[in-house]
């Protein structure tokens, strides 16, 4: 499920916050509280049919054989969000695209692994994301909003990526997205941090699953 992200810098010096606008689904007729609960649980089960796309979490290591990636949270000085927590968030937000999340203990960095809708046009997705970031942060001034797309080498292959930097005063907020494709499946690794080196360290903790 595609998400559009808004980067905002605010706070005492400046606090950076990622605003997530989730895509909506068709409205359902109102039912009793118990019926609503049953629908949510059923919806979750339907979306989780392809367990290979979900990947596998073993302690602090996440593996996804479909996209041939493995992420070691400890290697990036991060803590993995448990599968139970991700399941709870998925049900709560009625969004089942998030498959893995890890957060750092010190620098406030975060990495997500999300599976997008099959057949997602990556270049169109990136173009829309870039336009959203520029529009939502134009108040900072063009010189303080840097966002671009490029092709990078990731785990030995060329992949599409997006890099964004928002600056206010002495604080810069960084975000990097790396897009992976496997047949008709599309996934994105997203890293957010106020430390540029942490972005590289986090991506460096990804290896091939095989």
List each model region and its residues.
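C-terminal motif of bacterial Sec signal peptides marking the signal peptidase cleavage site
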Residues: 19-22
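Surface-exposed amphipathic alpha-helical segments
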Residues: 75-78, 183-210
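Short, surface-exposed beta-strand/loop micro-motifs that present aromatic residues
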Residues: 98-103, 172-182
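N-terminal, intrinsically disordered, polar/charged segments of Gram-positive cell-envelope systems
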Residues: 24-74, 80-81
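Signature of long, low-cysteine stretches enriched in small and polar/charged residues
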Residues: 127-178
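Bacterial N-terminal signal peptides that target proteins for export
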Residues: 2-9
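Short, hydrophobic/aromatic-rich segments at coil-to-beta transitions
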Residues: 56-61, 94-98, 153-164
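Secretory pathway targeting signatures of secreted, lumenal, and periplasmic proteins
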Residues: 65-120
